[in-house]
A protein has these predicted regions:
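Surface-exposed peri-terminal alpha-helical interaction modules
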Residues: 1-79
């Protein structure tokens, strides 16, 4: 098993870039003409907020929990 400090060292730059990219995307949405309304009401962005909360929590298996947030749990249509 690798040392946690080594994992941080190897992945920090990419994690930082992903955070900055997400922040820039949210800023672009907010600056759009209806951005404030969309930021507060769009179901996709609500899922993104839930995913960010899952990332911030101390519980393990963050990737699985985030995947479940974005998974479509709607039953398939009857054929």
């Amino acid at each position: 098993m690798r040392d946690a400090s080594k994992v941080v060292e190897e992945t920090f730059a990419e994690m930082r870039w992903r955070c900055l990219s997400l922040a820039a995307d949210l800023d672009r949405i907010q600056r759009a003409s209806d951005g404030g309304k969309v930021l507060s009401s769009d179901a996709r962005l609500n899922k993104l907020r839930a995913a960010l909360q899952a990332l911030l929590g101390p519980e393990p298996d963050r990737a699985e929990r985030v995947q479940m947030i974005f998974s479509d749990t709607t039953p398939p249509p009857n054929r």
